[in-house]
Swiss-Prot record:
The keyword Cell membrane applies. InterPro entries: Claudin, Claudin18, Claudin_CS, PMP22/EMP/MP20/Claudin. Involved in alveolar fluid homeostasis via regulation of alveolar epithelial tight junction composition and therefore ion transport and solute permeability, potentially via downstream regulation of the actin cytoskeleton organization and beta-2-adrenergic signaling. Required for lung alveolarization and maintenance of the paracellular alveolar epithelial barrier. Acts to maintain epithelial progenitor cell proliferation and organ size, via regulation of YAP1 localization away from the nucleus and thereby restriction of YAP1 target gene transcription. It comes from Rattus norvegicus. Expressed in the lung (at protein level). This is Claudin-18. Residues 195-261 are annotated as: Required for role in regulation of RANKL-induced osteoclast differentiation.
Length: 261
């Protein structure tokens, strides 16, 4: 029961984390314009992994996709790759973990096969969560670097006496969604790996005394003592008295009470 519960909880957490990773990858608010010390408030800009958007004070929003691949920063392309790899591994892990549930029987599949499938799905979930967390963290580090570079350029004119207008970007909502989703997927993978231990058959060896069914030539030897039933090989050379098998001379030398009539 505990193994099934651990599997189901791990699957649900991983499924929720995978949905969060997909949502974060498709969101446009990976970076949002910092409005602090910005005199222009009628225009709000934000960017995602696939396009950049401009929102006006009237409520009209215009988005423009990135029409180039080679012209994009290498960090942005790396983040894209990490998020896509995390999503693909998460989808495969979900499919494997569904068939690995202990409460689902498929043909003659035993617990050892389900244990291997559970461990495989758990490892996939862990890698998927790590990819999502690394991708979001790399993008966040890029934002922090650009933010402080833009801040330094704002106060560089005329010895810092003249402030120039610079567009600075800060963390968007997609970063927090990606961090939470990656953490949930990672926790789900750990729980699936823990559930694998409950499905693994116990192969430990225990010391025991071998027992054989009793027979004519069976001898039990505990600690050097030998006991025999009397019907073994040692008893074959012994002469056994048989009152029913006598010769004629034996009958004459050993009369019975019926001989005196």
């Amino acid at each position: 029961m505990a193994t099934t519960t651990c599997q189901v909880v791990g699957l649900l957490l991983s499924l929720l984390g995978l949905a969060g990773c997909i949502a974060a990858t498709g969101m446009d608010m990976w970076s949002t314009q910092d409005l602090y010390d910005n005199p222009v408030t009628s225009v709000f800009q934000y960017e995602g992994l696939w396009r950049s958007c401009v929102q006006q004070s009237s409520g009209f929003t215009e988005c423009r996709p990135y029409f180039t691949i080679l012209g994009l920063p290498a960090m942005l392309q790396a983040v894209r790759a990490l998020m896509i790899v995390g999503i693909v591994l998460g989808v495969i892990g979900i499919l494997v973990s569904i068939f690995a549930l202990k409460c689902i029987r498929i043909g003659s599949m035993d617990d050892s096969a389900k244990a291997k499938m559970t461990l495989t799905s758990g490892i996939m979930f862990i890698i998927s969560g790590v990819c999502a967390i690394i991708g979001v963290s790399v993008f966040a580090n890029m934002l922090v670097t650009n933010f402080w570079m833009s801040t330094a350029n704002m106060y560089s004119g005329m010895g810092g006496m003249v402030q120039t207008v610079q567009t600075r970007y800060t963390f968007g909502a997609a970063l927090f969604v990606g961090w939470i989703a990656g953490g949930l997927t990672l926790i789900g993978g750990v729980m699936m790996c823990i559930a694998c231990r409950g499905l693994t058959p116990d192969d430990r060896n225990f010391k025991a005394v071998s027992y054989h069914a009793s027979g004519q030539n069976v001898a039990y030897k505990p600690g050097g003592f030998k006991a025999s039933t009397g019907f073994g090989s040692n008893a074959r050379n012994k002469k056994i008295y048989d009152g029913g098998a006598r010769t004629e001379d034996d009958e004459q030398s050993h009369p019975t009470k019926y001989d005196y009539v």
